[in-house]
């Protein structure tokens, strides 16, 4: 398996930053009230991860080990500031909706964690791929949680998509069922904790079934290999 493929498998599933490492829970739980907000913050975090990993990797030979963490934080803060200004300029509605959670990307453990654990020890191309894979994994978790909360809470999907994609995206709004009274448990923070818990349990069940299938295939293979010499001896 190539290293690039392994990076994407780990980032999206095996070592997902949100569902396995449980990093960045503050924005994950606070912003995921709608699919649009979750997708917007996830894409912003992905862009920050790619740019930060690339910068850290490119500068790794000139960064003294004793002060590497403050330098990484300065790089992350610079990238986040640039991304924040881009969102403010081109998606002002989303900028207002996400509020303080855009600059809080600076303190996100996912970003500093990948810079320290991977980008500082690998070339620029692989570091950028690692940032992309990690960011897409976090975005997927954010989006699924946001979509579930929006559907259960308001009966809609992609409500406010125009904040992220422009006026044409209003056509993307789907009303799955009409409700005059939103389901507040899903919309408020307790719903975020419950939704994340169900997602963790679902991933655990899938992993357990996969391990059981692998164990069964391994047992069958060993049984067949053990039976082969016996069959050859009987034929002789």
Swiss-Prot record:
Name by which UniProt lists this protein: Ion-translocating oxidoreductase complex subunit E
InterPro entries: NqrDE/RnfAE, RnfE
Family the UniProt entry places it in: Belongs to the NqrDE/RnfAE family.
Pfam families: Rnf-Nqr
Topology of this chain in the membrane: Multi-pass membrane protein
Enzyme class: translocase
Protein origin, superkingdom: Bacteria
NCBIfam families xref list: PRK12405.1, rnfE
